[in-house]
Every structure is written in structure tokens, then in C-alpha cells.
């Protein structure tokens, strides 16, 4: 794709999200979603492979269905309330339709089937945009309508997302699918706390985006797409490989890394609201994600790939490309836990 065209498309994607973030009118929000969806399709298809075309078609059909449900919910809300403002959804049917539409856009269970397939069919750079930037707009609308959402519906979908995000990643060898299932699980953690403390959802989203951006950048740097290719990188780029392993542990929520902080604060907030069974169940299901990240780290760092020569390390390492954003992203992704007492001020 030529740079001028890419700049125009990327600016449209960003403009669509910014319209959703800044508008308090339902029609403008819907227009922002449509701008964002139509502009992201060429980015997903930039490889011009049959798999990328299939992934883009799946994404388009899912997002179009979600947009239709969203518009239906908006119209029902307009019929009953007579208002276009986002913050007020007095009708439970309209609230349910809007919630389902937004969770479908996020790829939460039971509307999660498109996320692994689409992520696997596109390039690493497109997958990075899909699993980070594309989550901001739907979550911002959920944040605004959180007082009107049915908590039981959202908690049920959140629990299903955490379960499926853990189970789905267990037998995967493709790194993009592993990150897609991890994204589904993280969406479950974000939405379970939404009706109790929306600020914690924003904090969780920020840490999730930082960790996922760092992981995708390192995968692009190493050209790693499978667990096998990742296990071959340690003797070429040992520092990068060790950073990837730390980021994976952080994504799994292992203390004392950054990914543990939002889970800790969410469990604490749920227990403050006299909920014991839900945070216990969420903590147990989070072990599924941690397990497949631990297994991936073990196969990468602690086992050697069969080789004909006896040399463990290459005599000359590959020169690392300079990525300006990577050092601060890695620091935030792995060393944010000591800042948790300061984060608790947000509550």
C-alpha cells in the first residue's frame, strides 16, 4: 500500500474512533463506528492473500451485524425516551441490544468466533491495530452507558469470555491466535468491573493495550508467527526473546509484573461489593491463560530446538532494529506493579 493512501486510511480510522470518544449523540457515535469499520478493511486486506480477504469479509459481516443491532437499540431508545443522548437508556430492551452490539464489536463471548480467525488471517501489524485500537471505541460507549447496563447480562458474558479466552488458547501453536484468545479473556476482565467501578476498566484497558503493543512489536521485530519460530529466536536475539517471555508472563497476570495489578484491583473491588464467588471463579479461570503462557515460555526458553551443530549460541548476533516506542512500552508492561498504591487513588 502506498504511503499517502495508508496515511489517509489510518487518519480515517483514528477519526472514527475520536468521533465515538467525543460525541454524546447516538447518531454521531454510530457514524464514527461506521467510519472506523469501513476504513480498517483495507488495512486488514493489505497482504492481498485469500486468507486476508476471508478474514476481512468475516470482520465486515460481524461488524455490520453489530452496527445493525446498535442502530436498532438506538431507535428503540429514541421511541421510548425521545432523546439522542448516550447516557440515558431507560428501556431494558434498548439497553440489552446496545450491550450485545458493543460486545459483538469487542469480540466477547458468545460472539467471539470471529476474533481468532480474523487475527490469524491478517498480518502482525494489522492484528496489532485490531486487538488494541479497535477496542477503544466500543469500550468508551460501554463506559458512558454503564449506569443503564443490566449487570447480570454483562457479568455472564464476561465470565464466558474469560473461560473461552483461557480454554481456546490451550492447544494453539499460532502466536496471533494465542493473543486473540488472550484479548477475549482481557475483555471479560474489563467488562466484569464496568458496572461497579468504570475507572478500573479504563486502567485495565491502558495496561492491556501497552502490553499487547509491546508483544506485537517484538513479534514483528523477530518475524515470529508460530511457537516454533519463536523457539528459534533465542540464539539470534537473546535479549528480545527474554523480553517477549516477560511480556507473556505479564499478559498472563503473573506477579510481580504489570499484568497482575489490574486483576488484583478488580478482585479487590468485587470483594468490596460483597461478591466472593465471582472473583474466586475469575481468579481460577485466569490460571488457564497463565498456563498456556507459562508453557510457551518453557518451550521457548528452557528447551533447545534440535540442531546439527553443537553450538548453543550464534557467534554473531543479529543487529537489533531501533524501535523508539519499545523501551517505554516494555517498562510500563513489566514494571508497573510498584505503582499500584498510586493507581488505587483512581478508585
UniProtKB/Swiss-Prot annotation:
Name the reaction it catalyses: a ubiquinone + NADH + 5 H(+)(in) = a ubiquinol + NAD(+) + 4 H(+)(out)
> Where are the membrane-spanning stretches?
3-23, 25-45, 60-80, 96-116, 122-142, 153-173, 178-198, 200-220, 237-257, 274-294, 323-343
The UniProt entry, under InterPro entries, shows: Complex_I_Subunit_2 (IPR050175), NADH_DH_su2_C (IPR010933), NADH_UbQ_OxRdtase_chain2 (IPR003917), ND/Mrp_TM (IPR001750)
Keywords carried by this UniProt record: Electron transport, Membrane, Mitochondrion, Mitochondrion inner membrane, NAD, Respiratory chain, Translocase, Transmembrane, Transmembrane helix, Transport, Ubiquinone
Q: What is its EC number?
A: 7.1.1.2
Q: Look up and give the membrane topology term.
A: Multi-pass membrane protein
Enzyme type, top EC level: translocase
Q: Which family does the record claim for this protein?
A: Belongs to the complex I subunit 2 family.
Q: Quaternary arrangement and interactors, per the entry?
A: Core subunit of respiratory chain NADH dehydrogenase (Complex I) which is composed of 45 different subunits. Interacts with TMEM242.
Q: What is this protein called?
A: NADH-ubiquinone oxidoreductase chain 2
